[in-house]
Amino acid sequence: MTRMSPGVLAPPRELLTPEQWKQRGRDQRREVPRLSHAQWEPPLDRPDPVDILEEQARTRVPDLVPIRYGRMIASPFAYFRGAAAPMAWDLAHTPTTGIRVQACGDAHLLNFGMFAAPDRHLVFDVNDFDETLPAPFEWDVKRLAASFAVAAREQEFSDHDARTAARLTVRSYRTEMFRYATMRFLKVWYSRIDIDEVTSLFDAVQPK
């Protein structure tokens, strides 16, 4: 019989009401206040990011490593896309609430897109799970928010706009998690963003 990692298939350890989960969150916020996420100082023993990438390259196809590096040096965002491992090292030295999830592991904005669901409906969702591992939920949220900020700056938006994009990303995560907290497990499992919903959002922000 094949052994299975518990991951997201494991039943929840506790069955709490949405209000109880909210209180649990407030309690954890006292231990890890939101302001604790606003600052980051590199640890004195922080390794060179290139060394991390070189260590990672040992497990890759040798002929493809130079191609990967060539793509990463094209721009700051291209480097960010390829540098999930160095960022994971940095995130491992940041505050967390201890809430672990089956993380995407590389939740930058270009790892979201459209694809056909099993029922052939077009949906918008995470489309890359090759780095997935159990990890603190904050890591995915921070990498996603950072990706919007880096992309905004690369496109020559102002620092204010870049911060706004990151803030709205985190706000959207928070509001959706609040909505999911009021839903039953199967309702959450089958929840999805249909392409018509995405199209309407884009249409709403287009200049008239």
Please identify what each model-predicted range represents.
Residues 80-92, 96:
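Active-site-flanking structural segment that lines cofactor/substrate pockets
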Residues 6-16:
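General secondary-structure propensity
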Residues 149-208:
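Contiguous mid-protein beta-loop-alpha structural module that forms a pocket-lining wall or clamp
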Residues 32-78, 82-85:
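Low-complexity, highly charged intrinsically disordered N-terminal segments
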Residues 98-104, 108-155, 163, 172:
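Catalytic activation segment of kinase domains across protein kinase-like and atypical kinase folds
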Residues 13, 68-75, 95, 99, ...:
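Conserved aromatic-histidine-acidic binding/catalytic patches
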Residues 14-33:
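Short acidic, low-complexity intrinsically disordered linear motifs used
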